[in-house]
Structures are given as structure tokens and as C-alpha cells.
């Protein structure tokens, strides 16, 4: 079964992949960690292949899974972005978590050891029915075990708290806090002006972080562009709201400025951290599920958009 991606999923993954340092403050906030931002982030492939009962190969796609390496210690994390809660979410979490664990499982002396990731969910919308915390409980022949799935609700964070805690990752989704008032803003210029002034404050604060050297030009442009992408989708029925906020946020920044910066060489470790991790995961998973060498090479080329020669290099590095 495949789940349809939303523009919000795309924004979430873009922020994770292109501005990976922004995830560190979220990890600290949700899991109570004390990462400094100097740690290494190594991404795992989002695609996980599973053998189904009918003999077909199934594929599941997570929003993101990665390791944070601090010195000699490392922890695995799995994050999902949800516009709202649904009844199948915990089932998907367990399915993803176990597959992530199996991808790096070890068998020693007839004992299989797997490590489940630290999992969490970011809710973009919330109401009284939205859980504050979730838990997965597993009843095994050896006893019952459980683990928590922490919940982060973006609508609970105001602008001051976002900037005080460095939760810049949440800025593109901040517009969800105003969603219930779109109709009011759309028909009242004064109220719309208040919203515009709030977003002017956001852009000014982002600019201050840039000038202070706390974020890069590329990160700034990505935050602005992803904010516009969310806005265009969520406010598509309210033209005044959409155009009013876009006017303050600066339009399609990423189409030229940030891409130019990226093409000039500011990759921020993407190739080292993401492509290497994805290649290793695709090869190792393919071998585990019994794919042929050709099938694994094909997946490397398609998933990573690389040449056959590069795929062969990855296969020889991470294969049998």
C-alpha cells in the first residue's frame, strides 16, 4: 500500500535534507537531548523494502530517519510529519520502526539484535482530540515491552518561543496557527495587515540571524521558500491572504538565489551525509531481501539519480 505525499511532506523532507542542522533543536526539544549542533547527521534511506505474503516486494517510505553521531556515541531517530492525527498512524510507526531496526540488525551466535529508533511525530494541526503522547506496546512470549512516541504540536509554539529555542524548522508551518482566521483576514484589510506585520517580524528576525552568522544564506532562502510553498497550498482559497503574506516573505526566493548558492558549492554535507547513507541502505537492504545484483544497481541509479559506474562503486563498497 502506498501513501500519497502532500506538499507538507515535501516541505518537511526538503528542510530535513537541505538544512539538516535545523532538526537538532527539535530533537533537543522533544527528546530532552543537549546536542550542540556540531554533531554529524547521517541519513538512512527513506525507502524500506519488505517481502509481502503474496511474494511481491513491498516498499514503505518514511518522512525521515537518521543517526546523530556525537563522538563515539550514536542514536537513531525517526520523524514523521502529519497534518493531523489518523487511526493508522501508530501502525505505520511500528511498521517503519521495525524495518529501520531490521535494516541494521545483527545476528551473533544465533541471537538477532535490533535497535528501534527514537521516534516522534510533528503535528501541523491539533485539536482537543490530538494526543499529547503516544505509545507502542509489544506483547512477546518473553514479556511485554513498550516505547514512547513523543508528540510535537507546531501550533503550540509562538514566534518568540520559536526563535528563543532555535526552532526555525517550524517557521514554514507557522501559518497553520492562523488557518482558522483565513476568512476573517481575507475580508478585512486591517486584520490582514496585522498578519503581514507578524510575518514582517519573522523575516526581520531571520535576517538578523543571517547577519549574526547563525544561519547561512541558503538556510534563510530555504526557510522563506518553504514557507511560501506551505502558504500557497493552505491558503489557496484565500487569495488576499496568500498574496499578502507572499508579498512580505519575498516570493519564490529559492528558484534563483538559493539554488545559485547551492550550485556554487554550498552543499552543507548533503552528498557526504545523505547520498552515502542512502546508497549504503539501498545496497544492504537489497542484499538482505535477496535482490539480484542488477536489481540493486537499478535501484541505486533510479533512487539516487546516478550513473551505472557510480552505482557499481557504491555496490562494491557496501555489497556482499
Residue spans of the language-model regions?
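Coupling/switch segment of ABC-type P-loop NTPase heads
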Residues: 163-191
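Short, charged alpha-helical interaction segments and adjacent helix-coil junctions
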Residues: 67-83, 105-108, 152, 186-320
Amino acid at each position: 500500500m502506498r501513501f500519497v505525499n502532500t506538499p507538507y511532506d515535501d516541505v518537511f523532507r526538503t528542510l530535513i535534507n537541505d538544512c539538516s542542522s535545523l532538526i537538532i533543536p527539535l530533537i533537543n526539544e522533544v527528546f530532552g537531548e543537549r546536542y550542540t549542533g556540531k554533531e554529524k547527521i547521517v541519513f538512512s534511506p527513506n525507502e524500506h523494502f519488505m517481502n509481502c505474503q503474496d511474494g511481491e516486494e513491498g516498499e514503505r517510505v518514511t518522512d525521515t530517519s537518521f543517526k546523530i553521531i556525537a563522538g563515539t556515541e550514536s542514536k537513531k531517530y525517526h520523524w514523521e510529519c502529519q497534518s493531523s492525527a489518523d487511526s493508522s498512524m501508530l501502525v505505520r510507526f511500528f511498521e517503519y520502526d521495525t524495518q529501520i531496526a531490521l535494516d541494521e540488525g545483527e545476528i551473533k551466535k544465533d541471537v538477532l539484535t535490533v535497535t528501534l529508533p527514537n521516534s516522534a511525530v510533528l503535528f501541523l494541526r491539533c485539536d482537543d482530540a490530538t494526543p499529547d503522547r503516544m505509545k507502542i506496546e509489544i506483547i512477546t512470549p518473553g514479556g511485554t515491552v513498550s516505547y514512547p512516541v513523543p508528540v510535537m504540536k507546531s501550533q503550540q509554539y509562538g514566534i518568540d518561543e520559536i526563535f528563543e529555542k532555535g526552532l526555525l524548522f517550524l517557521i514554514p508551518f507557522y501559518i497553520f496557527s492562523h488557518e482558522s482566521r483565513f476568512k476573517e483576514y481575507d475580508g478585512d484589510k486591517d486584520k490582514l495587515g496585522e498578519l503581514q506585520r507578524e510575518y514582517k517580524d519573522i523575516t526581520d528576525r531571520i535576517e538578523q540571524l543571517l547577519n549574526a552568522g547563525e544561519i547561512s544564506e541558503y538556510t534563510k532562502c530555504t526557510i522563506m521558500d518553504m514557507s511560501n510553498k506551505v502558504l500557497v497550498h493552505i491558503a489557496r482559497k484565500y487569495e488576499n491572504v496568500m498574496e499578502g503574506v507572499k508579498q512580505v516573505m519575498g516570493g519564490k526566493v529559492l528558484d534563483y538565489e538559493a539554488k545559485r548558492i547551492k550550485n556554487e558549492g554550498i552543499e552543507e554535507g548533503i552528498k557526504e551525509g545523505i547520498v552515502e547513507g542512502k546508497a549504503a541502505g539501498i545496497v544492504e537492504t537489497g542484499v538482505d531481501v535477496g535482490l539480484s545484483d542488477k536489481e540493486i544497481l537499478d535501484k541505486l541509479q533510479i533512487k539516487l539519480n546516478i550513473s551505472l559506474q557510480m552505482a557499481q562503486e557504491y555496490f562494491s563498497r557496501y555489497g556482499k
